[in-house]
Each structure stands twice: as structure tokens, then as C-alpha cells.
Amino acid sequence: MAIQIGTISLEGPVILAPMSGVTDLPFRRLVKQSGCGLVVSEMVASQAMIRENRQTLRMVECEPEQFPMAVQLAGCEPDVMAEAAKLNEDRGAAIIDINFGCPVKKVVNGHAGSSLMRDEALAARILEATAKAVTIPVTLKMRKGWDDSSLNAPRLARIAEECGIKLVTVHGRTREQFYNGTADWSFIRSVKEAVSIPVVVNGDITSFDAVDRALAESGADGVMIGRGAYGRPWFPAQVMHYIRTGERLPDPPLHEQLDTLLEHYDAMLTHYGVEGGLRVARKHISWYSTGLRDSAEFRSEVNRMSDPERVRGFIRDFYAPAIERMAA
């Protein structure tokens, strides 16, 4: 089971979802090292991109080791989206992904994200302008629709294909749902049936059973994993292996999870600097440690610390007895 996105062949049908504040360079690097068909940047505003805002440029930094990497753009002006796409192509992006799915109020009020599912004419102009501006493939991520009375993802997928889009990902919720309720994977079958380009299913893919059901119900060509990778950068690789072989690999042993956490922690400090790195690291440390004994107290203590060496030592001290218990 493989996915072809224009001229690019993915190693496997698993994509790391774009997630604001999560899929930065250190996290993408870890996921790609473990194994993942495609990693996607955090969503970036096209206006900030063409101004070459320093923070925005850091968010879309590409490494050869992460190939293929997609940069996700949000915006409502076709010419600006096109210019931002070209800038990212020049900076090494392998794929441009267009965001028609973000439900956040600030984005929607700016007539971007899922707001564009309510304006198919403007959506088409954005899709066409972006696809024509670059030589690399352009993809689209969207939701079922704005609400249950406007489930227009199949129609918008057809428009996207006509505009030159090479792959569509659908999150199985409406904008009105945000992340509430459960993802409707079966609806995505209607999108798959509407187009000839690959379709990827997204939403609530957090386990092997979910992978089975999502693919069976949607008929999709692949899966996009978002929150299922929180604290588990190895999960996309497990899913890749499972789809390829049918074998459900266990999570890495706890001492390897600790090594991964510390590698990630050091990478965040290097990428953001001490203060910024600690701020970003706290949520990841929380996700990694979820489910371990006394993890709530551990997270609370980490959140009060400001010395990076003290945090590193505290992480080791917290994991040590758990690793000993696992080895006993």
C-alpha cells in the first residue's frame, strides 16, 4: 500500500499531521527518524511567510533528512498563497499543503482555514493559483464541511482535483464540531469515490484498531496521524509497519522511551534556546510521561523548573524506578 503524490512516492501510507505548536523541526525529525511516509510542518500564515517573518521561517525549516516534507499554508488571498508556496519551494519544501480545515476562531475570522469551505469560488481560486505557482505537488487538508447542513467535502475535492491538487486529506469532523464527538470515517468514502487522486483519512487515529476501522470505513489510501503521536513519535512508524506486514509492534521499552524523550528535549533547547525550549518541552514531557506512576506530580514539578540541567536530571530520576520495575 503506497501513495503517489504527483511526482513523489511515499515510503508508506502514513502522514504526520500538521499541528500548531507540535510538529516543529525537532518533533518532525524524531518522527521521520522512526519512520513515516510524510511529515508536515505546523500551519503557517501565508502573509507572515511572504514577509519572511523570522519565527515563521523557523517553523518551515527543511532538512534533507526529513524528505519528503510538506509545508502547510493558510490564507485567503490567492496571490499571497501562491507567492508563499513559491518561497517554500525555493527553500526546499517537497510538497505544499493548503489548509481548509483549521477550526480555530482566529483563523476562521480571517477567512482562512475551514472558513474557505463556505466559499467554494474563493477556495477554487486559491487552489488553482497555488498549484500553478510551483512545480512541486500541492495537496489539500479539509473537514467534512462547515456543519452538518453543508457537507461539501466531496464537491470541494472534485474542484481541488480540477485545479491540479494531487492529494486530499479529510478530517472526519465538521468545523462546528471542532474536536468534539468522534471522527466520521465512513463519510470520507464519499470523497474517495468523488476523485481519482489519493484520499487520506484523518481524525482519532490513535491505535492499531483505529487504523483498521478508519481504512475499512473510508476506503482511503492512507492515514494521517495527529494527536495519536503526542508523546509517541514512534507511533507513525508502528502504523507503517502494521499496514505493511500486519504485525502490531509493541511500544519501545521504557529505557528507549527515556532516550527518545531526552533526545527530543535537547533538540528543543537547541532549536529554541533555553527559555523557549523549556516552554515548548513541558507539554511534550507531559505527553511522554502520561500513564506512568506519579506522573501528575512529576509534570507539576517540571512546570515549576527553569534550570534545564535540573529538568534533565529530574526526568532521569523520575523514569529510573519505572524502568527498574519493568526490568524486574
Swiss-Prot record:
Write out the catalytic residues in the record: C102 (proton donor)
Q: Which cofactor does it need?
A: FMN
Q: SUPFAM superfamilies annotated for this entry?
A: FMN-linked oxidoreductases
Q: Which reaction does it catalyse?
A: a 5,6-dihydrouridine in tRNA + NAD(+) = a uridine in tRNA + NADH + H(+); a 5,6-dihydrouridine in tRNA + NADP(+) = a uridine in tRNA + NADPH + H(+)
Single GO MF descriptor: tRNA binding
Please tell me which top-level EC class this enzyme sits in: oxidoreductase
Record keywords? Flavoprotein, FMN, NADP, Oxidoreductase, RNA-binding, tRNA processing, tRNA-binding
**What residues does FMN bind to?**
P18, M19, S20, Q72, K141, N202, G203, D204, G226, R227
Q: What is its EC number?
A: 1.3.1.-
Family the entry assigns: Belongs to the Dus family.
Purpose: Catalyzes the synthesis of 5,6-dihydrouridine (D), a modified base found in the D-loop of most tRNAs, via the reduction of the C5-C6 double bond in target uridines.
Protein name from the UniProt record: Probable tRNA-dihydrouridine synthase
Please tell me the species this chain comes from. Azospirillum brasilense
